[in-house]
């Protein structure tokens, strides 16, 4: 399940990046009893008023050149659902025009909840 989340975050970072010369940055750190994985892109960014809405089902940022009939606005909602099922948190920090960083925070004592 965590692989699904990471793949989705990386695919979104690649899709919304507008400068191929700037790499997508991925890091993992430990904070107390949590693992924190971050995915940073240098793409279009997300307006402050949309940052909570992007985790809602079917919500898509209206950036016309990124609209695609193969994307339905479910990926981030699915990611957040998976992470919260493991007592974690998925959040974003972003500035429009400067890219986004998604933070996946999960407990280090993660137990499988199959």
What residues fall within each predicted segment?
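Glycine-rich GHKL/ HATPase_c ATP-binding element in histidine kinases
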Residues: 98-100
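Conserved glycine-rich
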Residues: 87-88
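Short beta-strand/loop element within the Bergerat-fold HATPase_c
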Residues: 21-33
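Short alpha-helical Gxxx[C/S/T] motif in the catalytic ATP-binding
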Residues: 75, 79
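Short conserved segment of the HATPase_c
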Residues: 46-60
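Acidic ATP/Mg2+-coordinating residue in the GHKL
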Residues: 41
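Short helix-loop "hinge" at the ATP-lid/N-box region of the Bergerat-fold HATPase_c
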Residues: 13-14
